[in-house]
Amino acid sequence: MNVKKGVFAGRFPLVKKMFLCAAGVMSFWFTCNDVIASPRDYNSTVCLPDSSEEILYNGIRLPEAWPPDTESPESITPMRVPYLENIPDIIPIDVGRQLFVDDFLIEETTLNRVFHQAEKWEGNPVFFPETEHELGERHKNKAVTYLGHGGVFYDPSAQEFKMFYTAGWRGGLALATSKDLLRWERPELGLAGENLILPPGPLMAGGDNAIWLDLNAKDSAQRYKAIIERLHGWRSNFNTRDDSPTHTLHTSADGLIWSQGITTRRAEDYSSFFYNPFREVWSYSIKKSVSGRKRFYAESKDFMRGASWENMVYWVNADSLDEPDSEIGNTPQLYSLNGIAYESIMLGQFYILLGPYNRVCEEGRFPKITELKMGFSRDGFHWDRPDRRPFIEATRDEKDFDRAYLHGTMGVCLVMGDKLWFPYTGYSGISPDGYRGMYTGASIGMATLRRDGFASMEAGKKKGILLTRPVTFRGKHLFVNVDCPDGELQVEVLDEQNRVLKQFNAKTSRPIRTDKTLQKVEWQAGDDLSDLAGTPVKFRFHLTNGKLYSFWVSPDKSGASHGYIGAGGPGYDGVIDDKGINAY
């Protein structure tokens, strides 16, 4: 047998907001002093991690010095992932579906791991320039609706998807809504005209933005969170690189009326943030150029009070495994990085810039190429990037809306039934009237992936096995995500000494011959594993002619994983799967 071993606390005062005057005319009471305030105005302090050792939900132990300042921005060596070098002896699996994106869960296997790319929706683009704000010329570019970063989230209170996007190149911040991610409406907001939330301008919508819907906000006034770039002249700023404030943090109760901004430390455009619920911290993804575009990291328990980024460290960049475009030849760079909690891991959406250089694109009036790749993390900081193919690829064909300059969005992905949905922006470089420009012709599309479908462990006609490391759980029912309608899956349970438990052996495991993203495992003795709760055990999967994507132990027969579901989806009350099959 060919065996592979281990293949928000406190409310911030709102000074001046946008409001409708008595005559019904919109007034904007943002001035430089209004928008830009210092963190010390609110006695802000960065919530530094406790000096004691931190043990995560999955048994990973973090070092006392956190975030770790161990890497160099000058290095192109792939990021070390310490938890894959020092895996816990026993892994708790109470949180979420357990994915096979790395060897963290695997003691030994004869199955082959295969990574999968997203499939673009055949009806793309699903959202494109239509209004005067979107079609009009700004900064020598036209016909633009883009996620930069914006945000796409499911709002269970409104029972709809909300998309925050930019209308026009460096234009206003706008809102669109949808019931299915495919058909979108532009609600009349009565704020800045049509569906605009904030009009264009460095003190209003800014250069780019990143929006987050925080369904677990302790203060309802901070349900929405945002970072907005404040370049007073975006082109001149890139030339001078002066030290003027460039970003502000904001909160909002409804995503429409926003608080006064708190300035951050110096950073470049396309800086963003995400929430790590496993550690209950806000993680800031900060763009800085050090021999090319790189990412720096800071974190805080409180979103607004973390604006000072006092614990900022170098984080990650494109590395030696990111291949250049064969025709362009430029060294790849990390343009942006968004994160989201999905089931038991953090997903990282890496924007990899392949060139050409900006001046070449401006002179030629065509877009540069960025593509979206995926990374995976179990501690929210260290990224494992085993598959360097584009997860969503630029076509490089000017007839396509996603020819180049692909962007993902805040929230990264959403859940509907047995699929994950990934919103993304693409640029063709051409407007409907034939006008060409580097940042022209931007529309928004969707890409899908099987739920948990980032990687599968696969067997052919010859039976293969996968043995997990010792795990513990408090649930009762074992579930799998498996594709084997022409094959078979059986499961057995072992103790730490690899002795098969008689009542849960492979011979009495009821054969599974199906293609389902949520399938219960049963034995002749039943399906109740509660007697094993708290006891370290191993699962051994026997697979023929099939693909195994994930497994988990649920406390109830619905198969609810109690893991995270990205930016949410219909059928869920929040961003945790407590519904199981009832949300399908």
Segments from the language model and where they lie:
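Residue-level detector of transmembrane insertion/anchoring sites
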Residues: 6-7, 23, 170
